[in-house]
Amino acid sequence: MSEVTTAEFNEDGVYLRKVRSFVLREGRLTTGQAKALESFWPTMGLDYSPQAINFTEVFGREADTVLEIGFGMGASLVEMAANAPELNFIGVEVHKPGVGACLGEAGNAGISNLRVYHHDAVEVLENAIPDSSLARVQLFFPDPWHKKRHHKRRIVQPEFVELLRRKLKIGGVFHMATDWENYAEHMLEVMSAAPGYQNQSDTQTYVPRPDHRPLTKFENRGQRLGHGVWDLMFERVE
């Protein structure tokens, strides 16, 4: 599970400035991850700056763009990019070994429709992603911060989902997945109250795992043990 951001939120879901140093997320790189960063960052890495990027310039084409927040080691993100060459993918991850692993897998597979940030997700969204530009935002298995006193660290909060709404196109979708039922309920509560979104579930709750989200090894194992996974998909409608 990825912490995806160094942000913290208050009880009303208002984003507070960073509370921990980004440097703490560097982590220890394997030799392979270090080589991947050296080899593939020049072509696939996006250096953060507080100016909005131009997707057409970044990818060399016009295509719908999907952004994933906190991709972990990147295996499912690389698989999605390989399975949907017609889409652009941007991954954001604060854990450097994960960035190296993702770049290595994508680079060695010849993936050309994926770019990666090694930075805080909230800052990337606030400053580097143009408004009304994303076809989909993905948040898969974020840290659930299961202790009640840590719930303010959960990334799905009212102000954050309003930030995402600004970045999604009309018709764009925010897709979440979690294996913590309490966090799924929290996500559903926050999203159902958020203005400008429509739940894509017929029951106004959860949706079956869509084909575009790969089934992870962790998830496969959990399902055999009877563990649940909850997917939520909310469309920006205004």
Swiss-Prot record:
It comes from Shewanella amazonensis (strain ATCC BAA-1098 / SB2B). PROSITE patterns: SAM_MT_TRMB. One of its GO terms (molecular function) is tRNA (guanine(46)-N7)-methyltransferase activity. S-adenosyl-L-methionine binds at E68, E93, D120, D143. NCBIfam families: tRNA (guanosine(46)-N7)-methyltransferase TrmB. Pathway: tRNA modification; N(7)-methylguanine-tRNA biosynthesis. Keywords: Methyltransferase, S-adenosyl-L-methionine, Transferase, tRNA processing. It is an enzyme of class 2 (transferase). This is tRNA (guanine-N(7)-)-methyltransferase. The active site is at D143. Its EC number is 2.1.1.33. GO terms for cellular component: tRNA methyltransferase complex. InterPro entries: SAM-dependent_MTases_sf (IPR029063), tRNA_(Gua-N-7)_MeTrfase_Trmb (IPR003358), tRNA_methyltr_TrmB_bact (IPR055361). Substrate binds at K147, D179, T216, K217, F218, E219. It catalyses: guanosine(46) in tRNA + S-adenosyl-L-methionine = N(7)-methylguanosine(46) in tRNA + S-adenosyl-L-homocysteine. The lineage of its organism: Bacteria, Pseudomonadati, Pseudomonadota, Gammaproteobacteria, Alteromonadales. Catalyzes the formation of N(7)-methylguanine at position 46 (m7G46) in tRNA. It comes from the Bacteria. The keyword Ion transport does not apply. It holds the Pfam family Methyltransf_4. Belongs to the class I-like SAM-binding methyltransferase superfamily. TrmB family. CDD domains: AdoMet_MTases (cd02440).
